Amino acid sequence: MSHSSEQEIIARLSHAPCGKTVVNHLSENCAHSMLNACRWCAMCGKESKAQLDTLELYSGVELCFQTYLSSQFTHRHDAPASTVMEINHCRAGRIGWRMKDGLSLYLGEGDVSLHSMSRCTQSEIEFPLHCYEGLFFSVDLDALDANPPELMREAGVTARGVYERFCQENSAVLSACPQNASIFDGLYTIDRTILLPYARLKFQELMLVLSRTPAPVSAPTPYKADQIAVVRQIHEELLSDLGQRRTIEELSKRYLMNPSTLKDVFKFVYGQPIAAHMKEHRLERAALLLRTTDDSLSEIAAQVGYESQSKFSSAFKSVYGVLPREYRKQTFRLKSE
């Protein structure tokens, strides 16, 4: 996740109260919102922040933008009276659900998921990167198919048909691709004065595309909850002391997990191999130390796990585009202006 995306999320939630979920209804029919009808609620930590912006597109179709600063939420709602499909898109960060059937599902930037709303009546939502921005469409199959919008009607596309293709037995995940981006990205940036007609067009485009998209060959990998819990413990240990480098073999012996399974589950949860993920954290911490301390480059290199200052400088430049010394100069220059 880019530093700029994280800062945008922090800024957007700067006025949101801690420990609360703020729900804004962007359309007049908020009393008929599916979130209200299903008595949706989320319980979060005292330091967490969340904002949901909902918009009714058609009878039976709602769009909800969601922004979180949190590591975990407990989320529950009543089972809907009819079949409701939820289509999620991740714009920034990473999100994971532990559904009531034990299945864990994770999305990274650009990914799309589809599942029945009855699967997540009570679920734990995790944000491995501690912040998240995305959206989801809630689609009541019967209500939409009873009065479909023009483009879907002309193309012979039904909500029930899309549901049966992707959600009949399991949840489905469609990996990030240019087609996903072309449908979803504009929804986050379009002028709010034309959001409703634009979102209606994009929803119809999405349904037409999904009606012609093959369902994934395999369902999301059903890793066990205890395996994910162990990997989260490992992640916390790795972050607790960035100056130490621990091998996969060492971790697998200590936590009694097969090395291959450890690597697979870690990537499933955090979206990256262990080495790449930890490199990001090491260099983010290094950038913070360069901005906020007078520590020497060799001291900072050691604090983030680099024995060689030259290797540290090379790794830093590969991510930030400049050497650490120049990065520090640029930071001080901006502060003095």
Regions found by a protein language model. Name each.
Residues M1-S82:
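N-terminal low-complexity or simple alpha-helical regulatory segments
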Residues S48, L57-V61, H77-V84, S118-F136:
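Ligand-binding loop in jelly-roll beta-barrel domains
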Residues R232-S240, R245, E249-E250, F268-S310, ...:
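Terminal helix-turn-helix DNA-binding modules in bacterial transcription factors
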Residues L262, F266, K311-F312, F316:
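Short hydrophobic/aromatic patch on the recognition helix
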